[in-house]
Amino acid sequence: ANTSTEQKLNLSSAIIFCIVIYRGLRYHYQLLVLLLAAVASSAFPMSGLTYGFVGVGTMSSAMVRGICTLPVPPCSAVVLSPRGTAKSAALKGEFPALITIAADNQEVVDKADIIFIGVLPAHAEEVCRALKFSERHTVVSLVSTASMSLLHEVCSPVPHASIVRAIPLPPVAKHRGATVMTPPHAVISALFGSLGTVVPVESETVMKKMLPVSALMGQFYAQQRATQQWLQAEGVDADSAAKWTGAVFHCISYDSANANGHTFNELVEEQTPGGINEQVVREFTEGGVYDALSDTLDGILARVEGRPTPKRQKVKYSSTEEK
């Protein structure tokens, strides 16, 4: 059984690799279609792997949609737990050929090769302890607060190397996600790579330091909302204000999509001295915006690591126009 699962995992990696190439070679569409068709028609259609989701919340739903809409799904079946019945039923309606809904969580585990745990943090330990796992399984925890030591304990006898923590962001549903994960795992890294950008890190300690950045999502939207509101206050209609704001933020993010250690310094330094972009950076710096960002990330990291949040005396930004 272990050999069969290993063969499936290897073929799954090959299929996902083809999909990753497909996403990057937009001008070689016909070649990639032929390549994917050849893989799909091999002895193991769609790799033969079964994915199982214990807990079908927002993140699990996004992952299922992303997986099921890949050019060639890297699995032959997806089994969903009945928890979150409305979401499970909706996914079943969208992808009836791939998805089945299990009677309970144990049925998900029994039928799946790769199991994704997507329950609420408060319930994760209880849910996992109630399940009987096997050495053949690979377990991927999507629970932000579940430590590796806890997962190793409650998912026994799954080998430690086959237990992964991953924090994806919802755009995985559209293959535009971002995922940080530990430890590196060939098949799981390839899967998340097909759903967007994946950053595998070697240790849980490093992963914890990465997690606060994912908490900037709400702030990103709030900044756009504030920009839209400013435009509306200047007399621009709501739809035009929203469309322009969204387009600008989306456009300027492209240059940082594949960043290296020097990218952001270079992008900031490219702003024309005395220009309007440089003015925004300068005034935000003078107003303490970036210091506030750093302090907030410190606080989120403390929360992730289970430490008391640093207490700081914060002064609300204010300005008065000079006469």
Briefly describe each language-model feature range:
Residues 44-49, 161, 246, 250-323:
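NAD(P)-dependent Rossmann-like dehydrogenase/reductase catalytic/cofactor-binding core
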Residues 78, 88, 108, 124, ...:
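Small-residue helix-packing motif on alpha-helices
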Residues 44-103, 107-109, 229-233, 319-322:
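NAD(P)+-binding Rossmann beta1-loop-alpha1 motif at the extreme N-terminus of oxidoreductases
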Residues 30-40:
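Cleavable N-terminal signal peptides of Sec/SRP-targeted secreted and luminal proteins
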